[in-house]
Amino acid sequence: SSAASDVYKRQLYVEAGAGIQADFCLRARGDSMIGARIYDGDIVFIQQQDMVDDGEIAAVIIDDEATLKRVNYYPEKNLLILKAENSKYEDLIYTGEELNHIRILGKAVAFQSDIR
C-alpha cells in the first residue's frame, strides 16, 4: 500500500464544525503552508474532487506522496503550478507529460488546530 493511501485510509475521529462538508481529513505535516495558517499537525478537511478552482488549496498526490498546496492553472500553456504558503519552498511546476505525476484528491474546506 502506498504512503498516500495510508494517509487517507486512516479515519481520524474529529468533530467537524457544523456545516463543514468534507469527505475525509488529513493531518498537515511541516511548515510549507503556514502562510495559510495551516500548521504542522493540524487537521485539514478535504472535499473530494479531482479538480479545484485556480488559487484554491488542494490535497495533491505527487508520485505517491500526499501534500497540501495552493493550485494555480494556466490552461492555455497546459501548465499547473503548486505553491507552498511559505517563501522558503520553491514552486512546483508541471507541464505536459509531467502532469501525469500528480493527482488532485480534493479541496481543503476547513482546518482545525490541535489544542492540547
Language-model segments: residues:
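Short, small-residue-biased leader/transition segments that mark boundaries at the very start
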Residues: 1-8
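Acidic/glycine-rich C-terminal interaction modules and beta/coil loop segments
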Residues: 9-116
